[in-house]
Amino acid sequence: MTGDGVNDAPSIKSADIGIGMGITGTDVTKNVADMVLSDDNFATIVGAVAEGRRIYDNIRKAIGFLLASNMSEVLGVFFSALLGFTLLNPVHLLFINLITDCFPALALGMERPEPDIMRRPPRSAKDGIFSGGLGFDIAYQGILITVITMVSYIIGHCMEAGCFEMPRGVSPHGMTMAFLTMSMCEIFHSFNMRSQRRSVFTLRGHNKVLWAAMLG
């Protein structure tokens, strides 16, 4: 809802998004509006909607990446404890959380808008942050990274022991393999999170900040 006069104030206040005019609008309208057009140009609304959708998408990408990564760490430590071996040391988990996860998540917040961002229907106000299949994606991606990491630990342990056997206690080779595998999986997973709808190979442009976070 847009308006500039005092009579528009009730409608602007009750609308999901009330927009007031910054130049010709009254003070009453500006005070109750959710957004004020400083240039009174309706075309600015289009740019504001696109930017709002980009920010919301990027928040979902960062949250999805962090939760899937942390889920894989929690599940890996939990199941390895049940099986009687140590998957990762606390210092490994600290490094992954502070270095491997932190910078790619920040880089995902700077992702460019996707090409179809303005062709999507409006999002319902009742939709949660995990709607649209994001919750399911987090679950299966976290489980997948966990399985890959634990398999790499077993392979490293078998290489150290010289034969196939279930690990017990602490295996330096297995722990090294698990640490490197989980770190690389989460780094590549950050590229996977650039879009929930499109393949990373079909996205136009590059997120230079994400590449810098990976190489760093």
Predicted segments with their positions:
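Membrane-embedded transport module
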Residues: 20-200
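C-terminal substrate/ligand-recognition segments
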Residues: 216
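Short, mixed-charge, low-aromatic patches
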Residues: 4, 211-212
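Cytoplasmic-side transmembrane-helix entry/capping segments in multi-pass membrane proteins
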Residues: 201-211
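Acidic, Mg2+-coordinating phosphoryl-transfer loop and its flanking beta/alpha structural elements
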Residues: 1-32
